[in-house]
Curated annotation (Swiss-Prot):
Subunit relationships: Part of the 30S ribosomal subunit.
Annotated Gene Ontology cellular component terms: cytosolic small ribosomal subunit
Function: One of the primary rRNA binding proteins, it binds specifically to the 5'-end of 16S ribosomal RNA.
GO terms under biological process: translation
UniProt similarity note: Belongs to the universal ribosomal protein uS17 family.
Protein's UniProt name: Small ribosomal subunit protein uS17
PANTHER family named in the record: 40S RIBOSOMAL PROTEIN S11 FAMILY MEMBER, SMALL RIBOSOMAL SUBUNIT PROTEIN US17M
Gene3D superfamilies, per database record: Nucleic acid-binding proteins
MF terms in GO: rRNA binding; structural constituent of ribosome
Keywords, alphabetical: Ribonucleoprotein, Ribosomal protein, RNA-binding, rRNA-binding
Listed HAMAP family: Ribosomal_uS17_B
Disulfide bond residue pairs: none
PROSITE patterns: RIBOSOMAL_S17 (PS00056)
Length: 82
């Protein structure tokens, strides 16, 4: 296992759960045949201990041990408020 901790940045799409946020992470992928760059989105559940995030916030998250069946990321900081 690597010593580097994975960190990502994305936009909060849902904060309806208790101490959990859903973060959408956009990336650009090149189409294998046509060569055009396409936006692809990955949704990740992250732990928000203080319930401080709102929908539309840009946040930084980092990988951690599994906290539940679907949650293995935790909130590092709120980069910008919505």
């Amino acid at each position: 296992m690597s010593d580097k901790i994975r960190t990502l940045q994305g936009r909060v799409t849902s904060n309806k759960m208790d101490k959990t946020i859903t973060v959408a992470i956009e990336r650009q992928v090149k189409h294998p045949i046509y060569g055009k760059y396409i936006k692809r989105t990955t949704k990740i559940h992250a732990h928000d201990e203080a319930n401080q995030c709102n929908e539309g916030d840009v946040v930084a998250i980092r990988e951690c041990r599994p906290l539940s069946k679907t949650k293995s990321w935790t909130l590092v900081e709120v980069v910008s408020k919505a």
